[in-house]
UniProtKB/Swiss-Prot annotation:
Transition state stabilizer, annotated site positions: 34, 244
Cross-referenced Pfam families: AA_kinase (PF00696)
One GO term (biological process): arginine biosynthetic process via ornithine
Keyword tRNA processing: no
Binding site for substrate: 69-70, 91, 185
Compartmental location: Cytoplasm
Catalytic activity: N-acetyl-L-glutamate + ATP = N-acetyl-L-glutamyl 5-phosphate + ADP
Protein name, per record: Acetylglutamate kinase
Family of the protein in this entry: Belongs to the acetylglutamate kinase family. ArgB subfamily.
Keywords assigned by UniProt, alphabetized: Amino-acid biosynthesis, Arginine biosynthesis, ATP-binding, Cytoplasm, Kinase, Nucleotide-binding, Transferase
Length: 286
């Protein structure tokens, strides 16, 4: 056998050996994955993500998937003649828009993800936040401007655990309702954070369009709360990244072991972040 053939085989073997202690460590643990961005739009990336999630479940990690779908909601709204408006990055949601969100997010987007995981050998089940009181919500503090945008009040962990114990991957659409039956649009990042805290998850992983926290040309492998505060003060962490960073540390304060931010456009980033020493994104640490 030529050295050209031996080299890649040896590299593959080394990756598998490196993964083994992580597989042992995380068997039976719960990972909440927030799925969004470009990884939801490109067919190659969608298939790769579904493969990665299926593999994680096959090696014994309990996966709970929370997804976004903002672009799909906007497209559906446009077809129905509805204009999308945003305040501080949140979609203004009236009764017409909440119907579009429920139809699109809990309908087509959710079922497409379930189908894709199934095609790659996984067993997924679509869950609307309305199912079995999965997500109870209350109005956002800025409801006067935002309308039917909600914040998570309570998670039905018994239902999610029941699905996970059956070997299924719950795929959760972040909509919720209150005790009066009012429906709410819930930010997917916020929903993923609340679900991971409620489940006492080992990890929360944000699959996004950025490679991690970047300083100059370097992606930080880890970042502490003090380091993040300094980078925010210096303007290096800015814009939409600030609430994501704040949410990550709030999630850890709530008892979640680790929070990761990875690039969904990078090849097999989910597996590499979890099963290799170096990782590929940024890990938030206490």
């Amino acid at each position: 056998m030529s050295s050209e053939r031996k080299a890649p085989h040896a590299a593959i073997g080394q990756v598998l050996i490196e993964a083994l202690p992580y597989i042992r460590q995380f068997e039976g643990k719960t990972f909440v994955i927030k799925y969004g961005g470009a990884a939801m739009k490109d067919d190659t990336l969608k298939n790769m993500f579904a493969q990665n999630v299926t593999l994680l479940r096959k090696v014994g990690i309990r996966i709970v998937l929370v997804h976004g779908g903002g672009d799909a909601i906007t497209r559906t709204a446009e077809k129905l003649g509805l204009q999308s408006r945003f305040v501080q990055g949140r979609r203004v949601t009236d009764k017409e828009m909440i119907s579009v969100i429920q139809m699109t997010l809990a309908g087509k987007v959710n079922q497409d993800i379930v189908q894709l995981i199934s095609e790659h050998g996984g067993k997924a089940v679509g869950v609307s936040g309305l199912d079995a009181d999965t997500i109870k919500a209350h109005p956002h503090p800025n409801a006067e401007q935002l309308g039917l945008v909600g914040e998570v009040e309570q998670i039905n962990t018994d239902y999610i655990d029941l699905l996970s114990q059956a070997g299924l991957i719950p795929v959760i659409a972040p909509v919720g309702f209150d005790c009066d039956g009012n429906l709410y649009n819930i930010n997917a990042d916020d929903a993923a954070s609340s679900i991971s805290i409620a489940l006492k998850a080992e990890k929360l992983i944000y699959v996004s369009d950025v490679a991690g926290i970047q300083v100059g040309d370097k992606i930080l492998k880890t970042i502490s709360k003090a380091e993040a505060a300094d980078l925010i003060e210096r303007g290096i962490i800015s814009g939409g990244m600030i609430p994501k960073v704040v949410s990550a540390f709030n999630t850890m304060d709530g008892g979640v072991g680790k929070v990761h931010l990875i690039d969904g456009k990078s090849t097999h980033s989910l597996l590499l972040e979890i099963f290799t020493h170096e990782g590929v994104g940024t890990q938030f640490i206490n």
